[in-house]
Design a protein with these regions (language model features):
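Hydrophobic alpha-helical segments and helix-packing faces
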Residues: 24, 28-32, 46, 69, ...
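Charged, low-complexity intrinsically disordered segments
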Residues: 151-206
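Active-site-proximal alpha-helical scaffolds that flank and shape metal-associated catalytic sites
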Residues: 2-4, 9, 13-15, 33-34, ...
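Beta-strand elements within well-structured catalytic alpha/beta cores of enzymes
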Residues: 13, 46-56
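Non-transmembrane, aqueous-exposed alpha-helical and coiled segments at domain scale
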Residues: 33-48
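Short catalytic/ligand-binding loop motif for oxyanion handling, primarily in non-cytosolic enzymes
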Residues: 57-62
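Flexible, D/E/H-enriched segments
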Residues: 1-30, 41, 63-158
């Protein structure tokens, strides 16, 4: 909504990294690679910003509470830019040893980096360690070339393969994004009828 607080659509990806078992670094990297494929498969010429969050080195429990490792944080940010595969191959225990157990949540940054090409330009980097966790802001510009159109078309066919022909079945309506959005609006309207003021407006309009 161009008139809203965000100049575009926001699609959140939530990753649980607090209660174990949590995803591996490699799994989140693969999610990022798949996200890139999905973005490239859109027929529209989209402008997309991929954002990631997660505290750098910190630990908030046990005798190691208050742990901070700014040297590791600097190394992590450098590897994220230049050699992300080194981070992909690390185990959660290695992240915990270097950056604290809660600091292992930086693996979420690998979704963002996985969605970018190998060729990125560092636009901005700043770190600040005010108390029990290091904070960083990092901005990359993706310099990767245009996607291979044959590969994009093959991916589109792959996505549609499982449902191909289902929409032609009589009385069958696959829940597409458009239908889901329409149903959400209807369900929101119906749910809001529990609110007296909304119900009164409905009765008056009816």
């Amino acid at each position: 909504d161009e008139t809203g607080p965000w100049p575009g659509r926001v699609v959140p990806l939530q990753v649980g990294v607090l209660q174990f078992p949590i995803p591996s670094a490699k799994r989140l990297w693969k999610l990022g690679r798949t996200l890139r494929k999905a973005i490239e498969s859109y027929p529209e010429d989209l402008n997309v910003a991929v954002m990631a969050t997660g505290g750098l080195s910190h630990q908030v429990h046990g005798e190691r509470a208050g742990f901070l490792n700014e040297a590791w944080d600097a190394e992590f940010l450098d590897l994220l830019e230049k050699a992300p595969q080194a981070l992909v191959n690390m185990r959660i225990a290695e992240y915990a040893a270097k950056g604290g157990l809660e600091g292992a949540e930086v693996i979420m940054w690998l979704i963002m980096r996985g969605a970018l090409s190998d060729n990125v330009r560092l636009v901005h980097k700043q770190t600040y360690a005010p108390s029990v966790t290091n904070i960083a802001t990092l901005v990359f510009d993706d310099l990767g070339g245009e996607p291979d159109q044959a590969a994009v078309e093959a991916y589109r066919r792959h996505i549609g393969h499982e449902l191909e022909g289902a929409s032609a079945l009589p009385g069958t309506y696959p829940l597409t994004h458009a239908r889901s959005h329409a149903n959400l609006r209807i369900n929101t309207f119906l749910h809001d009828l529990v609110k007296p003021e909304h119900r009164a407006r409905f009765v008056d309009d009816f």
